[in-house]
């Protein structure tokens, strides 16, 4: 009987292949039959024969979700728009752009009308802003940071790292209830691809650095820069830079717009993990499901393609 592999098992397969170990040895290490490893590698390797554990796990998750949900296409366009709004939490503009790529025409204005016409308020609850908008003024203050040895200012970052080049990343932490739990978030700026993981040790700097290096290691050839804020949890940035052969740059204080990709991504995450949540009560599978959902959300900047599709196009 075929057993579903875990993320950890797929990562072990990836490392075993890198170390040129046999499939039999890898299978013995992770406790599965050799045929399971053989099938996994054959099924999820790219055209060049390279196996990427991250891609493999996302494909497996999507196959499981497709088999679990009803895939019947609604007869009416409004029903399909409603499904995408409620089921995927996409914005009206994302729904309109995505359906247009599929040859179905509906304006985002009409979808907003549908939301306003819904007396129950259910559709409104799936909009990120709940149909309420606030204008924020950007402020800038002088940066004086003394808690990060060897800090490299964002003003030293290459001009090419402006958000259009592939391989420039941003990172941040989302902190849970009582500052007792944290989730690390990483975002590739040009494609908005998200990687996130809960930190069992919270904001402990060494654990943060080790997790960043581990999560980005499979993509290390495409990690040209990393930009973050001045949180003390990132004080071991040299450890990250050494592991990935890159440079970590720090934004100015009170200038969150200097790392806008990760800030906007964190707001999307808050749709599923609201402020005041104790992350210790969330399963790793749930956190990964949030990552999957955000990465398959179409973006206007990508011509309504998805971060997942565009990221792996350039990777493969």
Residue ranges and their predicted role:
Residues 181-183:
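Short loop/turn microsegments at loop-to-beta-strand junctions
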Residues 1-89, 93, 97-98:
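Short, basic alpha-helical/linker "hinge" immediately adjacent to a nucleic-acid-recognition surface
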Residues 13, 37, 81, 95, ...:
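Mobile genetic element proteins and their domesticated derivatives, centered on retroelements
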Residues 175-179, 196-220:
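Active-site beta-loop-alpha junctions of metal-dependent nucleic acid enzymes
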Residues 31, 75, 79-87, 241-248, ...:
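Charged alpha-helix within mobile-element recombinases
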Residues 55-59, 63, 106-161:
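Basic, flexible linker segments flanking DNA-binding modules
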Residues 221-236, 254:
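Acidic/histidine-rich, metal-coordinating catalytic segments
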Residues 166-176:
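Two-metal-ion RNase H-like nuclease active-site motif
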């Amino acid at each position: 009987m075929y057993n579903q592999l875990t993320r950890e098992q797929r990562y072990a397969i990836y490392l075993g292949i890198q170390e040129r170990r046999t499939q039999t040895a890898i299978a013995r290490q992770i406790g599965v039959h050799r045929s399971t490893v053989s099938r996994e590698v054959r099924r999820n390797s790219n055209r060049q024969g390279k196996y990427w554990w991250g891609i493999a796990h996302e494909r497996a998750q999507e196959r499981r979700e497709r088999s679990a949900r009803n895939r019947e296409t609604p007869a009416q366009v409004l029903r399909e728009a409603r499904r995408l709004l409620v089921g995927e939490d996409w914005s009206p503009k994302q729904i309109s752009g995505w359906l247009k790529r599929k040859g179905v025409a509906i304006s985002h204005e009409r979808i907003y009308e549908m939301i306003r016409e819904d007396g129950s308020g259910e559709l409104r609850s799936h909009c990120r802003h709940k149909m309420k908008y606030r204008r924020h003024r950007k402020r800038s203050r002088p940066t004086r940071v003394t808690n990060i040895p060897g800090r490299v200012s964002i003003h030293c970052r290459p001009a090419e790292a402006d958000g259009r080049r592939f391989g420039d990343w941003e990172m941040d932490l989302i902190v849970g209830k009582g500052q007792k739990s944290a989730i690390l978030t990483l975002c590739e700026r040009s494609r908005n691809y998200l990687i996130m993981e809960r930190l069992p040790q919270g904001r402990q700097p060494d654990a943060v650095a080790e997790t960043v290096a581990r999560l980005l290691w499979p993509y290390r050839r495409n990690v040209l820069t990393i930009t973050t804020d001045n949180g003390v949890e990132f004080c071991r940035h040299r450890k990250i830079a050494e592991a990935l052969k890159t440079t970590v740059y720090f934004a100015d204080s009170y200038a969150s717009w200097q790392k806008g990709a990760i800030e906007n991504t964190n707001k999307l995450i808050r749709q599923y993990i609201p402020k005041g949540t104790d992350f210790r009560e969330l399963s790793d599978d749930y956190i990964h499901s949030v990552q999957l959902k955000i990465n398959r959300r179409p973006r206007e900047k990508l011509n309504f393609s998805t971060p997942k599709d565009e990221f792996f196009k350039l990777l493969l």
